[in-house]
UniProtKB/Swiss-Prot annotation:
Signal peptide location: none
HAMAP family documented for this protein: CemA_PxcA
InterPro entries on file: CemA (IPR004282)
A Gene Ontology molecular function term of the record: proton transmembrane transporter activity
The organism of origin for this protein: Huperzia lucidula (Shining clubmoss)
Subcellular location: Plastid, Chloroplast inner membrane
Name under which the protein is recorded: Potassium/proton antiporter CemA
GO CC terms in record: chloroplast inner membrane
Pfam families: CemA
Cell cycle is among the record's keywords: no
Family under the similarity heading: Belongs to the CemA family.
Keyword terms: Antiport, Chloroplast, Hydrogen ion transport, Ion transport, Membrane, Plastid, Plastid inner membrane, Potassium, Potassium transport, Transmembrane, Transmembrane helix, Transport
A GO biological process held by the record: potassium ion transport
C-alpha cells in the first residue's frame, strides 16, 4: 500500500506541474513589473547621483531583468512540456478500479486532456482495454464510489455548459448495483476554476512579455546585453532610443582611478545626497548592488576555474588520449618527439648496458662464456624494448598535455573576451574588497605576496617550478636556462612592484606604504 501511495504522490505532483510552473512564471512577471517601476523611481534621482552609481544601477537592474525573463520562458516551457506528457498519458487511458474487483464493468474516467487542451467531453471507457491495466496502481487510490449519475457530476454539467460543453447526451451505467469510481484529487469544479486561473496567468504573462518588448524597444534595451551611456539630463531618457546607438559610450562598472582619491569623491557625493534628503532611498539599492557584485564575481571566478577543468579532463580521457594513441602508433614511425628525449633514452640505454655488462663480468665463467654472451644480448634487447615503450608513452603524454593546456587556457581567454562586463564587475568587487581592509591587513597581504614571489627564499621554488614545467612540456632539464631565468625574473618583478608602490599605492593610500616599509624593515 505504501508503494501505491508513493506512486500516487508522484502522479499527483506531476499533474500539478502546469499549475505550479504557471504560478512561478506569473510571479516572475510581477517582479518584472516591479523592476520597471523601480527604474522610473531611480530615474528621478539621476541629478543627485554620481555617474558611476547610475551606471551600476542600470547594470544591476538589467541583470535582474534578464534573470526573471529567463525564469518566465523556462516556466512556460515546463508548463507546455508537462501538458504534452499528460496528454500522452491520457491517450493511453487511465483506469479506475478497486482492489479485488474484476475488470468487467465500465468505469468513469476524467479525461486529462479536457482540463489542459480544451477537449470538451468526459469519457466513459471500458476496463477491458488491455492498455489500461498497467495504470492499475495509480487508479485504485483516492477513489470514491458513486451510483449512476453522481451529484458532483450533475453540478459540474452547469460549468461545462457555460464553457460550451454538451452534457445532455451523456450515457451512464443503468445497473444500480454497478459502481463507478471517479479518480481525482480535487472535484471537477475546483479543477475548472484552477484551469481558468491558469489561463488568466498565462494571458497575464503574455501581456507582460509583450509590454516588456515594447519597453525595451523604447529604451533600446537588449535581452542579454546592455550598453550604458552617460547620465541623462532632465527630460531625457537614461537609455538611448533606437537610432542613437552610435552615440552610446560603453563604460565600466567600477570607479576609474583619477588624481583625486575615490574616497573623497564618494564622501562628497554622500554629503550631497544627505543634503537633498534622498539617502534613505539609496540604502536598499546599495545593499542589492553589493550582493549582486559579490555573487556575480564569485560565479564568474568559479566558472573560470571549474569550466576549463570540467571540459579538459573528460576531453583528455575519452577523446584526445585514444585519438593521439591511434595517430602516433599507426601513422607515425618515430618514437621520440624531440632531440632531448632521444638523448635521454641513449644515456639511459648506455647505463643499462654498462650495468648488465658489469654483472656478467663479475659472474664470468670460462666454461660458459658463449652462453653468458647470448644472455647479455637478450637482456640488452629486452631492456631496449622496455625503454622504447616507455619513451613512446612519454611522447604521447607530452602531446596530450600540450593539447590539454591549449584547451585549458583557450576557454578562460574566450571567457575574458566575451564576458568583459562580468570581468569589470569582478574587478570592481576585488578593488572594493581590498580597499575595505585596514592598512595593516593591506600591507600584510602585499608583503606576503612579494616575499613568496620575489623574496630571498624564492629562487629554489622558481627552480622547481621551471623544471616541472619543462618536464611537463617534454623538454630536458637545463640548469643554465633555469639559473638565467631565476637570476633575472625576480629582479624585474621587484622593480615593477616598487614602481607600482611609488606610482599608484603611494597616491591612493600613503599610510599603506608607511606600514609596508615598517613591516618590511
Amino acid at each position: 500500500m505504501k508503494f501505491k501511495l508513493y506512486w500516487w504522490e508522484v502522479f499527483r505532483w506531476f499533474s500539478d506541474t502546469p499549475s505550479r510552473s504557471s504560478e512561478r512564471a506569473c510571479e516572475a512577471s510581477r517582479q518584472v513589473q516591479h523592476i520597471k517601476k523601480d527604474y522610473v523611481s531611480y530615474k528621478c534621482l539621476v541629478p543627485s547621483l554620481p555617474k558611476h552609481s547610475w551606471q551600476a544601477i542600470i547594470l544591476y537592474m538589467n541583470t535582474r531583468l534578464n534573470n526573471f525573463v529567463f525564469i518566465i520562458y523556462w516556466s512556460v516551457l515546463e508548463c507546455k512540456t508537462s501538458i504534452y506528457l499528460l496528454n500522452i498519458l491520457n491517450k493511453l487511458g487511465l483506469i479506475v478500479s478497486v482492489p479485488g474487483k474484476s475488470f468487467s464493468s465500465p468505469k468513469l474516467l476524467i479525461n486529462i486532456r479536457s482540463f489542459f487542451n480544451g477537449n470538451k467531453r468526459l469519457r466513459i471507457m471500458s476496463q477491458s482495454n488491455p492498455y489500461n491495466i498497467w495504470l492499475y496502481p495509480l487508479n485504485i487510490l483516492l477513489s470514491f464510489p458513486v451510483h449512476r449519475k453522481p451529484k458532483k457530476l450533475r453540478s459540474t454539467e452547469k460549468i461545462f455548459e457555460k464553457n460550451g460543453f454538451n452534457c445532455e447526451n451523456r450515457e451512464y451505467p443503468h445497473d444500480k448495483n454497478d459502481k463507478t469510481y471517479f479518480v481525482s484529487g480535487k472535484s471537477s469544479e475546483e479543477e475548472l476554476v484552477r484551469i481558468e486561473r491558469m489561463n488568466q496567468k498565462l494571458a497575464w504573462i503574455e501581456a507582460t512579455l509583450n509590454d516588456l518588448d515594447n519597453w525595451k524597444r523604447y529604451y533600446s534595451l537588449s535581452s542579454f546585453s546592455f550598453e550604458m551611456g552617460d547620465i541623462p539630463e532632465e527630460g531625457q531618457s537614461s537609455l538611448s532610443v533606437e537610432g542613437e546607438s552610435d552615440s552610446i559610450v560603453t563604460t565600466i562598472a567600477y570607479e576609474s582611478i583619477g588624481l583625486v582619491p575615490r574616497s573623497i569623491t564618494r564622501t562628497l557625493s554622500r554629503f550631497k545626497t544627505e543634503l537633498t534628503g534622498q539617502s534613505s532611498s539609496l540604502v536598499l539599492y546599495e545593499f542589492r548592488l553589493a550582493k549582486y557584485q559579490a555573487l556575480a564575481s564569485l560565479q564568474y571566478l568559479g566558472c573560470l576555474i571549474l569550466i576549463p577543468w570540467g571540459i579538459s579532463f573528460p576531453s583528455e580521457r575519452w577523446l584526445l588520449k585514444p585519438w593521439i594513441k591511434n595517430w602516433w602508433n599507426i601513422n607515425q614511425f618515430q618514437i621520440f618527439l624531440n632531440y632531448f628525449q632521444e638523448e635521454r633514452a641513449s644515456k639511459r640505454l648506455q647505463e643499462v648496458e654498462e650495468l648488465l655488462w658489469l654483472d656478467e663480468v663479475m659472474l664470468a665463467d670460462s666454461s660458459s662464456s658463449e652462453v653468458q654472451s647470448q644472455d647479455l644480448n637478450r637482456q640488452i634487447h629486452d631492456k631496449t624494448i622496455q625503454l622504447v615503450a616507455m619513451y613512446n608513452e612519454d611522447s604521447i603524454q607530452t602531446i596530450l598535455h600540450l593539447l590539454t593546456d591549449i584547451i585549458y587556457f583557450a576557454i578562460p581567454s574566450a571567457s575574458f573576451i566575451s564576458g568583459k562586463k562580468r570581468l569589470a564587475v569582478m574587478n570592481s568587487w576585488i578593488q572594493e574588497s581590498f580597499h575595505s581592509l585596514s592598512d595593516t591587513m593591506k600591507a600584510f597581504f602585499i608583503l606576503l605576496l612579494t616575499d613568496s614571489c620575489i623574496g630571498f627564499h624564492s629562487p629554489h621554488g622558481w627552480e622547481i617550478l621551471i623544471s616541472s614545467l619543462s618536464k611537463h612540456l617534454g623538454f630536458a632539464h637545463n640548469k643554465h636556462i633555469i639559473s638565467c631565468f631565476v637570476s633575472t625574473f625576480p629582479v624585474i618583478s621587484d622593480t615593477v612592484f616598487k614602481y607600482w608602490i611609488f606610482r599608484h599605492l603611494n597616491r591612493i593610500s600613503p599610510s599603506i606604504v608607511a606600514t609596508y616599509h615598517a613591516m618590511n624593515e
